[in-house]
């Protein structure tokens, strides 16, 4: 066989892995196109449309988060038991997401919304374990890059989704019609994944072991560094339950702000554009200088921005701040741009670090653990809704910011293996 023939054969796996990377990044962008627009613009519309208080609104978030957590863990099991069928599982996730949004769009009452939100959580959650597991297997030498590209797709979706939905809400459709029509592009994205990430032959007998996932889960939990990363992410997720669900509503409801849907969309879009720029840089830096600096720096910055949102009404009353002409809106916009630009970037840095410290095996199991760390976020939307109903938004964001001292301290104490 000629040298050219050998080179051509060796190039095929490389081309296939980059094809899978492009497809999974696109699928992740499609997923977050829905998620970003739903939480940023459509969830507030549901609250206003049904006349919900913050606790009732928080219940929807808690229901969705609970379903999301359960199916993330299930996704980890299937992702590691059937790694050769990752494309099918990703496609099922995207299709299920579209069906879930459609069902929410046709529900006429708040009581019926509650079970419908179980589907809202289930579809998207099934995406990450097989997708990130596949990327980790395909890119063992460039994990930081592959995971950051996966996160880059999320940022793109978070940019495009609010712009599209903001335009539709302002000019063409109401929120229920948007949710009904959303099933079509979701099914189209699922079909694309099926074509570009095809199933492959089973590689080892391990794929047939029904209980491999649970053994891998137990083995992963014996890794102390991985466990501490999971605990840090779990405590961060509690704060995310306040900021993620209630920040868009706060911008719409606060009498000193009263943002329009398009203004909310533009603000979050700008933050995610910054995130899309930062994400690959963080991935590159993580591969070069290590995970700890990026994790501690990112967590500290998110803690600062969350506290700034909560304290903004006090800060603008300080005389030197007044003299500088800084208004409440200036501070809020500044804080949200920081928070939004790092939110997904930091999460995917957690994923990359967890995959790296766990070794080569059971990547989907590790991903399900990382996303399963959101267990503390299950109840936080409802709890923070109760706090908002009693004390208002500012106290809520201050509490969420204070809580981030815990993961920041944990990350500061960790010792990661030296990058070589």
Identify the function of each model-found stretch.
Residues 2-16, 200-229:
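Juxtamembrane intracellular "pre-TM" segments in multi-pass secondary transporters
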Residues 177-195, 397-412:
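Symmetry-related core transmembrane helices of the 12-TM Major Facilitator Superfamily/SLC fold
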Residues 158, 357-391:
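A late C-terminal transmembrane helix in Major Facilitator Superfamily
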Residues 38-40, 225-276:
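Extracytoplasmic gate region of multi-pass secondary transporters
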Residues 291-350:
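C-terminal transmembrane helical hairpin of 12-TM major facilitator-type secondary transporters
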Residues 70-108:
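Conserved MFS/SLC helix-loop-helix module at the cytosolic interface between two early adjacent transmembrane helices
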Residues 71-84, 279-290, 388-389:
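Helix-to-loop junctions at the C-terminal end of transmembrane segments
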Residues 117-153:
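Cytoplasmic helix-loop-helix junction between adjacent transmembrane helices
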């Amino acid at each position: 066989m000629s040298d050219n023939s050998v080179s051509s054969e060796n190039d095929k796996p490389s081309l296939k892995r980059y094809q899978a990377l492009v497809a999974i990044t696109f699928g992740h962008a499609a997923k977050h196109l829905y998620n970003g627009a739903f939480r940023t613009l459509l969830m507030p519309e549901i609250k206003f449309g049904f006349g919900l208080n913050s606790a009732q609104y928080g219940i929807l978030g808690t229901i969705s988060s609970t379903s999301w957590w359960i199916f993330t863990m299930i996704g980890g099991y299937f992702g590691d038991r059937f790694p050769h069928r990752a494309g099918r599982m990703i496609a099922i996730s995207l299709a299920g997401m579209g069906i879930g949004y459609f069902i929410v769009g046709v529900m006429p009452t708040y009581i019926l919304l509650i079970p419908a939100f179980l589907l809202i959580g289930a579809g998207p959650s099934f995406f990450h374990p097989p997708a990130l597991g596949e990327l980790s297997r395909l890119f063992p030498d460039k994990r930081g890059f592959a995971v950051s590209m996966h996160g880059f797709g999320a940022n793109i979706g978070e940019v495009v989704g609010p712009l599209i939905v903001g335009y539709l809400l302002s000019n063409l459709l109401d929120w229920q019609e948007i949710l009904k029509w959303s099933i079509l592009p979701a099914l189209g994205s699922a079909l694309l994944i099926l074509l570009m990430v095809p199933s492959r032959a089973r590689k080892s007998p391990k794929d047939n072991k029904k209980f491999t996932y649970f053994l891998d889960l137990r083995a992963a939990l014996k890794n102390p560094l991985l466990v501490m990363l999971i605990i840090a992410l779990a405590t961060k997720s509690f704060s995310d339950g306040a900021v993620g669900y209630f920040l868009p509503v706060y911008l719409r409801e606060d009498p000193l702000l009263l943002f329009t849907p398009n203004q909310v969309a533009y603000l979050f879009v700008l933050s995610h554009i910054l995130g899309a720029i930062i994400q690959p840089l963080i991935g590159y830096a993580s591969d070069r200088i290590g995970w700890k600096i990026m994790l501690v720096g990112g967590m500290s910055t998110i803690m600062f921005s969350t506290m700034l949102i909560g304290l903004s009404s006090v800060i603008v009353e300080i005389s030197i701040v007044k003299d500088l002409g800084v208004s409440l809106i200036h501070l809020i916009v500044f804080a949200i741009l920081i928070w939004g630009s790092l939110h997904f970037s930091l999460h995917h840095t957690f994923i990359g670090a967890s995959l790296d410290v766990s070794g080569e095996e059971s990547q989907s199991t590790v991903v399900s653990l990382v996303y399963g760390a959101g267990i503390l976020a299950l109840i936080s939307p409802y709890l923070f809704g109760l706090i908002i109903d009693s004390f208002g938004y500012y106290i809520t964001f201050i509490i969420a910011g204070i809580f981030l001292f815990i993961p920041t301290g944990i990350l500061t104490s960790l010792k990661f293996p030296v990058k070589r």
